[in-house]
């Protein structure tokens, strides 16, 4: 869904912060899409006696950004203020939290539906949501749709959320029970996710409850006991990231970046740029949350990174000089490098993660460069 631009919008929105023993950074980019429909939430220290708790989420909107924007501002309140979450006096139990998260999703969805019906023109937008609620003892992963979150523990992917796709047997069964069908892996041949907030055109089957509709607003919630020694970082991202990078790939790439910089915004920017250069055509948003035992900057890794950048710079110069008259285009340079066995490329990111370094050298050495052109405008990145 959605139209594409002639060239991607690469300006990024960034934020970072720390508290409760956590550090986070985030980056979002419109990319090739005509509109930016992603939104995000990052809150360290919750109100009402939950100062040691934190909440992070990414919302991937479709058919508009209204639902994503509303959820990023109000979902947390719907979760923490309902009676299921509060439970009895004192800190909420694990079951209180899980029930409260579910209730919060159903409540905000119903609230948005009522607001939409009161308007003359009903809002047809929807949004996925993936998030984490982090208490001193537990991490609660929350997922509704096909955005994804993962936990890297002891240098490996320890947990990741499951995408809610119409082709999933349990999702397909619910869709068919509601009178719908799954065609070309979409709900009624149209919507690519089987759970989402909003999308009220898919939630009007009479005699069915809110979690029995063609599209369900019910999140999956998983609680994981925190491990101070082994927990390293959490990644939350929309499908514009996961379309081109697998779980292990992204975990490896982020870990390698944390060994060369402690700037979490920069790490997230590298993730977004790398995914663009790997061919992602969607909006892209990523939040990186680091625990105290996250990888630290390594002098050895920094030295290897510097050596790699110098090697790439020299190879670009050699490729341009070898051309003789004129200058080869950047696509030719990238394809030449891609055909070579280059040591020490960042795992998961590979050559795409070094595109900015290569392009900077190319532009410096290219006397014919037109500043109005954008090498990313080609469909075939290399």
From Swiss-Prot:
Q: Which GO terms describe its molecular function?
A: magnesium ion binding; manganese ion binding; phosphoprotein phosphatase activity; protein serine/threonine phosphatase activity; R-SMAD binding
Q: Which cofactor does it need?
A: Mg(2+); Mn(2+)
In this UniProt entry, the residues modified to Phosphoserine are 375, 377
Give a Gene Ontology cellular component term annotated to this protein.
membrane
Q: Look up the domain of life of the source.
A: Eukaryota
EC assignment? 3.1.3.16
Q: Give yes or no: UniProt keyword Cytoplasm.
A: yes
Query: What residues does Mn(2+) 1 bind to?
Result: 60-61
Membrane topology, from the record: Lipid-anchor
Xref: CDD domains: PP2Cc
Binding positions for Mn(2+) 2 per the UniProt entry? 60, 239, 282
Please name one Pfam family that this protein belongs to. Answer: PP2C
- Subunit structure, per the record? Monomer. Interacts with SMAD2; the interaction dephosphorylates SMAD2 in its C-terminal SXS motif resulting in disruption of the SMAD2/SMAD4 complex, SMAD2 nuclear export and termination of the TGF-beta-mediated signaling. Interacts with SMAD2; the interaction dephosphorylates SMAD2 in its C-terminal SXS motif resulting in disruption of the SMAD2/SMAD4 complex, SMAD2 nuclear export and termination of the TGF-beta-mediated signaling. Interacts with the phosphorylated form of IKBKB/IKKB.
Tell me its family. Answer: Belongs to the PP2C family.
State the protein's purpose.
Enzyme with a broad specificity. Negatively regulates TGF-beta signaling through dephosphorylating SMAD2 and SMAD3, resulting in their dissociation from SMAD4, nuclear export of the SMADs and termination of the TGF-beta-mediated signaling. Dephosphorylates PRKAA1 and PRKAA2. Plays an important role in the termination of TNF-alpha-mediated NF-kappa-B activation through dephosphorylating and inactivating IKBKB/IKKB.
The protein in question is named Protein phosphatase 1A
The organism of origin for this protein: Bos taurus
Whichever gene encodes this chain, its name is PPM1A
């Amino acid at each position: 869904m959605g139209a594409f631009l002639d060239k991607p919008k690469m300006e990024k929105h960034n934020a970072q912060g720390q508290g409760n023993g956590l550090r986070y950074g985030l980056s979002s980019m419109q990319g090739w899409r005509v509109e930016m429909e992603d939104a995000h939430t990052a809150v360290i220290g919750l109100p009402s006696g939950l100062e040691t708790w934190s909440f992070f989420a990414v919302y991937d909107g479709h058919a508009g950004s209204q639902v994503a924007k509303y959820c990023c501002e109000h979902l947390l309140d719907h979760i923490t203020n309902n009676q299921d979450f509060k439970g009895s006096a004192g800190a909420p139990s694990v079951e209180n939290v899980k029930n409260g998260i579910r209730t919060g999703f159903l409540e905000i969805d119903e609230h948005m539906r009522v607001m939409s019906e009161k308007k003359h023109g009903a809002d047809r937008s929807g949004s996925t949501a993936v998030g984490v609620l982090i208490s001193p003892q537990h991490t609660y992963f929350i997922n509704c749709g096909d955005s994804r979150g993962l936990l890297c523990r002891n240098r490996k992917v320890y947990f990741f959320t499951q995408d809610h796709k119409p082709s999933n047997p349990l999702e397909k069964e619910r869709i068919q029970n509601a009178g719908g069908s799954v065609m070309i892996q979409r709900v009624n041949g149209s919507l690519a996710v089987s759970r989402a907030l909003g999308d009220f055109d898919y939630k009007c089957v009479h005699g069915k409850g809110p979690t029995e509709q063609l599209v369900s607003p019910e999140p999956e919630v998983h609680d994981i006991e925190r491990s101070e020694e082994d927990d390293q970082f959490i990644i939350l991202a929309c499908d514009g990231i996961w379309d081109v990078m697998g779980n292990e790939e992204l975990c490896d790439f982020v870990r390698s970046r944390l060994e060369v910089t402690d700037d979490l915004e920069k790490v997230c920017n590298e993730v977004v740029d790398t995914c663009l250069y790997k061919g992602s055509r969607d909006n892209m948003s990523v939040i990186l949350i680091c625990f105290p035992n996250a990888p630290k900057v390594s002098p050895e890794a920094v030295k290897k990174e510097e050596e790699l950048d110098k090697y790439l710079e020299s190879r670009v110069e050699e490729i341009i000089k070898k051309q003789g008259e004129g200058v080869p285009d950047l696509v030719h340079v990238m394809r030449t490098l891609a055909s070579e066995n280059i040591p020490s490329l960042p795992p998961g990111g590979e050559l795409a993660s070094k595109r900015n370094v290569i392009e900077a050298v190319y532009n410096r050495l290219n006397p014919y460069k037109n500043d109005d052109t954008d090498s990313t405008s080609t469909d075939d990145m290399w």
